[in-house]
C-alpha cells in the first residue's frame, strides 16, 4: 500500500485531513476547530508522505516529526498521525487500539470538555447553577471541569480581581497575567465552595485556571482550596498558548500542596514532557492528541508518566468528532494512570450527520464504550459533507 495524496480541507471551517492510498483505503484526522488557518501547514508535508506505506506509521512519522514544533506545525503532524493510524487499522481490519497494544479497559471515562453553560456575572450562584445543569445532563458526567480565574471572563467581570489591566479581547489566558488581589482570592474560593455544595462527594470537580497566575498565587490558591478535595487545578502558570512549560515553577507549587496540579495541553512531543515528568513538577499531565504529535505519542507520554507516579487526563475540547474517535482508541490502551479525557462534541450539530459510526448516545454514565470497528472506527459521509466544504475544497472526497 502506498500513499498517493495528502489532502486538507475546511469542513464548516474545521480543518480535516485525508490520506489517500492506492488501494482505496483512506484515513482521516482532525485539527482543533479553532485553527482554520491550518490547511497550508498540513499540505507542506505532502511531498514527504506520497509514496510511503501508511501502515508503517512510525517510519512515516520519523520523516516528519522533527519538522514539527509548537502550534501550528505540531497540530498538522498530529492530524496526519491520526490519519495514518486510521489507514493502518482499516488495512489490518482491526481497531487502532489493537495496534497500540490492545484494550486495558472496555469503557473510557470522559469529562465535560465541549459542554459548557453560559455565565455572565461569574458569581458563586452562577457557578453553582452551571454545575447543577452539568450534573443533570444526560451524559451522566462523573467529572466536571469549570473555567475560573484567568481562564474565564472572571478576570474582567469581577472588579479588582487582580492587579492588572485585562485585555478586552483575545484567547482565554493568552494575554492576561498579574498578581491576584485578596478580593480575587476570596471570590475564587467562594465560587469553588458553591460548586462543591452542588457536586458533593459523588462528582469530581476540576478547574481550568489559566495560564496567568504567578507561582506564589498559584500556591496560595491551591492551599486555600485543599479542603475541597478538587480533582485538579489546570494550567495555572503556563498552558494553552504559551510556547514553554516552566517545570521548575510548577514543581514549586506541586510539592507544597495536596491539591493536584495539571498541565500539558500545549506541549508538542514526548521530549518536551521529559522535564515536567522527571521532576514530578505536576501530579497530572494532559497532552492533546491533536497537538502533542498524535495518539501514539500520547500513549508514550502516559507510560512514562506512569513510571514516575503521575496521572494522565488528556485534553481534547476542540478536537471534533474525528478527534473524539482518536481519543477513545488511545485511551482504551493507556495504563492505569488514566483518569479521563476531555470530551469534544460535534459543533455545529450537523457534524453528527457527517461523521458516521459513533454510538448513539455517545456518552452514558460518564463513559464511552470502546467500539471494535477497524481504524478509528468512523467514516465520513462525503455526500452529507459536500455542502459544508468551501468551493476550493469540493474535490476533497474525489
Placement of each model-derived feature along the sequence:
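Hydrophobic alpha-helical hairpins/lids featuring a short glycine-rich hinge
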Residues: 73-111, 115-127
Amino acid at each position: 500500500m502506498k500513499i498517493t495524496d495528502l489532502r486538507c480541507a475546511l469542513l464548516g471551517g474545521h480543518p480535516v485531513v485525508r490520506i489517500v492510498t492506492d488501494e482505496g483505503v483512506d484515513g482521516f484526522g482532525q485539527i482543533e476547530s479553532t485553527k482554520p488557518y491550518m490547511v497550508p501547514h498540513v499540505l507542506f508535508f505532502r511531498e514527504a508522505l506520497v509514496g510511503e506505506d501508511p501502515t508503517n506509521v512510525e517510519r512515516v512519522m520519523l520523516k516528519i516529526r522533527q519538522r514539527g514544533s509548537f502550534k501550528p506545525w505540531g497540530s498538522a503532524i498530529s492530524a496526519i498521525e491520526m490519519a495514518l493510524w486510521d489507514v493502518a487499522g482499516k488495512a489490518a481490519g482491526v481497531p487502532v487500539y489493537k495496534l497500540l497494544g490492545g484494550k486495558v479497559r472496555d469503557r473510557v471515562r470522559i469529562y465535560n470538555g465541549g459542554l459548557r453553560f453560559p455565565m455572565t456575572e461569574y458569581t458563586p450562584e452562577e457557578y453553582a447553577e452551571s454545575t447543577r445543569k452539568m450534573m443533570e445532563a444526560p451524559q451522566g458526567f462523573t467529572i466536571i471541569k469549570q473555567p475560573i480565574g484567568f481562564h474565564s471572563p472572571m478576570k474582567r467581570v469581577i472588579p479588582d480581581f487582580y492587579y492588572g489591566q485585562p485585555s478586552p479581547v483575545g484567547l482565554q489566558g493568552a494575554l492576561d497575567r498579574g498578581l491576584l488581589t485578596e478580593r480575587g482570592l476570596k471570590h475564587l474560593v467562594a465560587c469553588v465552595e458553591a460548586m462543591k455544595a452542588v457536586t458533593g462527594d459523588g462528582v469530581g470537580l476540576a478547574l481550568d485556571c489559566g495560564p496567568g497566575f504567578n507561582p506564589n498565587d498559584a500556591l496560595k490558591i491551591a492551599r486555600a482550596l485543599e479542603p475541597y478535595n478538587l480533582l485538579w487545578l489546570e494550567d495555572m502558570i503556563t498552558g494553552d498558548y504559551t510556547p514553554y512549560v516552566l517545570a521548575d515553577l510548577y514543581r514549586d507549587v506541586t510539592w507544597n500542596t495536596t491539591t493536584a496540579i495539571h498541565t500539558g495541553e500545549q506541549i508538542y512531543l514526548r521530549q518536551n514532557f521529559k522535564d515536567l515528568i522527571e521532576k514530578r513538577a505536576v501530579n497530572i499531565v494532559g497532552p492533546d492528541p491533536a497537538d502533542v504529535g498524535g495518539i501514539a505519542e500520547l500513549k508514550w507520554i502516559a507510560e512514562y508518566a506512569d513510571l514516575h507516579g503521575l496521572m494522565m487526563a488528556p485534553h481534547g475540547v476542540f478536537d471534533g468528532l474525528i478527534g473524539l474517535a482518536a481519543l477513545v482508541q488511545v485511551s482504551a490502551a493507556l495504563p492505569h494512570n488514566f483518569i479521563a479525557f476531555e470530551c469534544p462534541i460535534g459543533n455545529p450539530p450537523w457534524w453528527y450527520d457527517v461523521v458516521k459510526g459513533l454510538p448513539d448516545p455517545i456518552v452514558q454514565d460518564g463513559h464511552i464504550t470502546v467500539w471494535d470497528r477497524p481504524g478509528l472506527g468512523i467514516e465520513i459521509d462525503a455526500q452529507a459533507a459536500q455542502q459544508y466544504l468551501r468551493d476550493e475544497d469540493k474535490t476533497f472526497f474525489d
